[in-house]
Amino acid sequence: MNLLHRRYCRSDAWQRAVQHGMMPWVLRDVGLGDKVLEIGPGPGVTTDWLRERVPALTCVEIDHDLASSLKKRLDGTNVTVVEGDATRMSFPDASFRSAVCFTMLHHVPSRELQDGLLAETHRVLKPGGLFIGSDSTSSFRFRLFHVFDTCVSVEPDRFAAQIGRAHV
């Protein structure tokens, strides 16, 4: 993330938008189950909302500094933070009842790696498990937040085909 994006993702405005808007809307009437995987928690705004609602949450974060910060902040809670690449997770098959991925898939540097992340997530989900997430669509403001940053947009009209390519 570039500096502007990193600051915004840690802001009170973003926290309010996520915790009072996006998360309740996306997860309304959804039972996530007892073991939940969060992919790419970043600074942990979505993690904070989730950990109050699920018994056990495992987060996979590729960024060393973000993973270290989350581990320290969430030590002693129901959250396990794993520093790692979600395209190559070390969990056994069928480890989680559900997986969530919020506003981060566009940070994965290629469609092929996005497909790999989707396939790997499918592998670690129990049969019939849920994969739930959201991402931003491309807009002028969205692109400004990603100047000099990795940004491979996930377009809604192409996502079903992308899931098919990942053999999910």
Q: How would you name each of these model-derived features?
A:
Residues M1-A17:
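Class I SAM-dependent methyltransferase Rossmann-like catalytic core
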Residues Q15-D34:
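Conserved alpha-helix/loop element of class I SAM-dependent methyltransferases that forms part
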Residues G33-G42:
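Conserved class I S-adenosyl-L-methionine
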Residues P43-R88:
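Class I SAM-dependent methyltransferase SAM/SAH-binding core
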Residues V100-C101:
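A conserved beta-strand element that flanks and buttresses the S-adenosyl-L-methionine
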Residues D115-P127:
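A short glycine-rich, Lys/Arg-flanked "PGG" loop and its adjoining helix->strand segment in the class I
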Residues G128-D135:
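Conserved beta-strand signature within the Rossmann-like core of class I S-adenosyl-L-methionine
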Residues A166-V168:
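Conserved small/polar residues in nucleotide/adenosyl-binding loops
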